[in-house]
A protein has these predicted regions:
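Mature catalytic core of soluble alpha/beta enzymes
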Residues: 2-13, 20-370
């Protein structure tokens, strides 16, 4: 079993889940809907994708066709959704040969970049972020499978093929003139599998914002399943206002209460939490956040981690990684990597039925009471 991760005293080098940070939205269903405020020029698109809802707001006299956003989100789903039987990631996960390669043309440029980002973040967090955790997620009943009897022997047997190391799971691409011609995957164990859920929605909001940027839109907010990226200002000329939930056990999307409002401009903000999705085993709560280094649900007292970063992919993935690391190791990480430009809010179990709040100076500077 891996020793606990420790970021204290290490020389610095520069560079899923259920999210709970949200813009205040009106839930919607079915096909995309929206409106246009003629006075402010604010356009809004609302819809459903990736098993959740999305909201896209931007200031422009010209409205973008809903299909542009719907098609992009569907493309991401076709590549990395574990709930679509024929998705690319499920084809990779089903590949049961260790003596040959699984190859494909990565024409959508989804899986290749996600793998590259995941490798970078895996190294940065010393394995706290790891998309090969999928078999453990299934073992603990937080994926498509029901939870069975789980003990040390079951965990140890699965841990034998967890890890972003070449002899367990490896991916490479051959690039030609800026176009990835072919991608191949090698498995060291046929049971190895990928799960990009802890980064895919953050990456998706980055892609959606890029659509807006390419059209010259300077002021926009994109939210998907609680993962948010903001550009410029809102219709009032102020930073976008994003609400962060209180980590109240048993709360739902309908009866949530807010801990604070955050002013966000030209950044992404994402949250991961443990207080809404868990199993109870013999009276003990088992978080859906699985520590890839131990194979067991994280049990460090951290209830919620909110991260502001330059991209949605980074904020999304690091929010999950910080839930694995816990509050103290997250603080050590922030000290070690100031060049990442992160601002973070942590809410932890105080051992007395409540929670303690800690925020980095940069996060506190842009936060206010709801």
């Amino acid at each position: 079993m891996r020793k606990a991760i420790n970021f204290q005293g290490i020389p610095a080098s520069l560079v899923l889940a259920v999210p709970f940070v949200a813009a205040v939205l009106t839930a919607c269903g079915g096909a995309a809907t929206g409106n246009h405020d003629k006075e402010s020029g604010m356009q809004q698109h609302l819809g459903e994708a990736q098993g959740t809802t999305y909201s896209i707001k931007y200031i422009s006299e010209e409205r973008i066709d809903d299909a542009v956003f719907e098609d992009l989100l569907d493309m991401v789903d076709r590549e990395v959704s574990l709930w679509r039987p024929n998705s690319r990631i499920n084809q990779i996960n089903a590949w049961d040969r260790t003596d040959s390669l699984f190859g494909f043309v990565d024409s959508t440029q989804i899986i290749g970049p996600l793998w590259a980002l995941s490798e970078e973040l895996h190294g940065l967090t010393k394995g706290a972020f790891d998309p090969t955790v999928s078999p453990l997620v299934e073992l603990w009943g937080f994926g498509l499978s029901e939870m069975g009897n789980v003990g040390a022997s079951e965990v140890d047997s699965v841990m034998a093929f967890i890890g972003m190391v070449p002899d367990r799971f490896d991916m490479n691409e051959e690039e030609e003139a800026g176009y990835y011609k072919s991608t191949w995957v090698r498995k060291g164990d046929a049971r190895a599998a990928l799960d990009f859920n802890a980064i895919a929605q953050g990456y998706s909001v980055d892609l959606l914002m890029e659509v807006l940027r390419e059209r010259g839109i300077q002021n926009a907010m994109v939210e998907l399943g609680g993962e948010v990226v903001c550009r410029g200002t809102n219709a009032s000329g102020d930073p976008w206002r994003i609400a962060v939930d209180r980590p109240i056990e048993g709360s739902t999307e309908q009866d949530r209460t807010f801990e604070m409002i955050v002013a966000v401009q030209d950044r992404a903000i994402c949250t991961s939490g443990s207080y809404r999705k868990y199993h109870e085993v013999d009276g003990r709560k088992m978080s859906h956040t699985i520590d890839p280094g131990t194979g067991w649900p994280a049990a460090n007292g951290l209830l919620s981690a909110t991260v502001m970063a330059s991209t949605g992919a980074y904020a999304d993935a690091l929010a999950t990684a910080f839930m694995v690391l816990g509050a103290e190791q997250t603080k050590a990480f922030l000290t070690l990597y100031p060049g990442l430009g992160l601002d973070v809010l942590l809410m932890s179990d105080d051992g007395q039925g409540g929670y303690a709040v800690w925020s980095s100076p940069g996060f506190a500077a842009v936060s206010s009471q709801p």
